[in-house]
Amino acid sequence: MCGKFTLFSEFDDIIEQFNIDQFLPEGEYHPSYNVAPSQNILTIINDGSNNRLGKLRWGLIPPCAKDEKIGYKMINARAETLAEKPSFRKPLGSKRCIIPADSFYEWKRLDPKTKIPMRIKLKSSNLFAFAGLYEKWNTLEGNLLYTCTIITIKPSELMEDIHDRMPVILTDENKKEWLNPKNTDPDYLQSLLLPYDADDMEAYQVSSLVNSPELIESH
């Protein structure tokens, strides 16, 4: 799964790397060493002409949901079953997004009683993009709430020693294809969702401190 990640890159770097044409005011971007579910997170969609940067709440709420609490159970979606699950089938065809990040965390189990936090990133330290889906939900007050989920896949060689799942990190080419609203074939879209090349990534143990620059330092 993916339950925590970081995004502390410069705002201008995000705009440039993801070819953003429309974006929220820079003052609404808050770098974080501990991006977590239920937070409003930076996301990118394509409207057919432009890449747009905005915020969606992390934890997808299907339109048919009667209670927003279901979002806490839907922070991730399995790549292999997107086309089969009612909550993900429709957004797979028409509501795809990417989530910028510069690393993510996972807990590695050493024994039945011991787990240690690991930080996983690109060796280049570059920004990358998680594959995601989004939806809109009518609240009980009649307001629209936009939410998202991060897609996971079987682990790479690097990740399999840490966890049995990993978030889908899109290559530059697949990132464009994933955002392209003209792509609607579920088989093709699912073919873009692959474990990222383990040779281009690294993982190391970090502190369990929350929302601190020290969280990303090797221990």
Curated annotation (Swiss-Prot):
InterPro entries named in the record: SRAP, SRAP-like
EC number: 4.-.-.-, 3.4.-.-
Residue numbers bearing the Thiazolidine linkage to a ring-opened DNA abasic site modification: C2
Residues the record marks as active site: C2 (nucleophile), E106
Pfam families, per the entry: SRAP
Gene Ontology molecular functions: lyase activity; peptidase activity; single-stranded DNA binding
Domain of life (superkingdom): Bacteria
One BP term from GO: protein-DNA covalent cross-linking repair
UniProt keyword list: Covalent protein-DNA linkage, DNA damage, DNA-binding, Hydrolase, Lyase, Protease, SOS response
Regulation: Formation and reversal of DNA-protein cross-link depends on DNA context. Catalyzes formation of the thiazolidine linkage in presence of abasic sites in single-stranded DNA. Mediates the reversal of the thiazolidine cross-link in presence of double stranded DNA.
Transmembrane region(s): none
Required for sensing abasic sites, annotated site positions: E106
Site (Required to stabilize abasic sites): H163
Function field: Sensor of abasic sites in single-stranded DNA (ssDNA) required to preserve genome integrity by promoting error-free repair of abasic sites. Recognizes and binds abasic sites in ssDNA at replication forks and chemically modifies the lesion by forming a covalent cross-link with DNA: forms a stable thiazolidine linkage between a ring-opened abasic site and the alpha-amino and sulfhydryl substituents of its N-terminal catalytic cysteine residue.
Description of its domains: The N-terminal catalytic Cys-2 residue forms a thiazolidine linkage to a ring-opened DNA abasic site. Glu-106 catalyzes reversal of the thiazolidine linkage; self-reversal is favoured by duplex DNA formation. Glu-106 is also involved in sensing abasic sites in single-stranded DNA (ssDNA). His-163 stabilizes the abasic sites by forming a hydrogen bond with the O4' hydroxyl group.
PANTHER family: ABASIC SITE PROCESSING PROTEIN HMCES, DC12-RELATED
Protein family (similarity comment): Belongs to the SOS response-associated peptidase family.
This protein's name: Abasic site processing protein YobE
Provenance organism: Bacillus subtilis (strain 168)
Gene name linked to the record: yobE
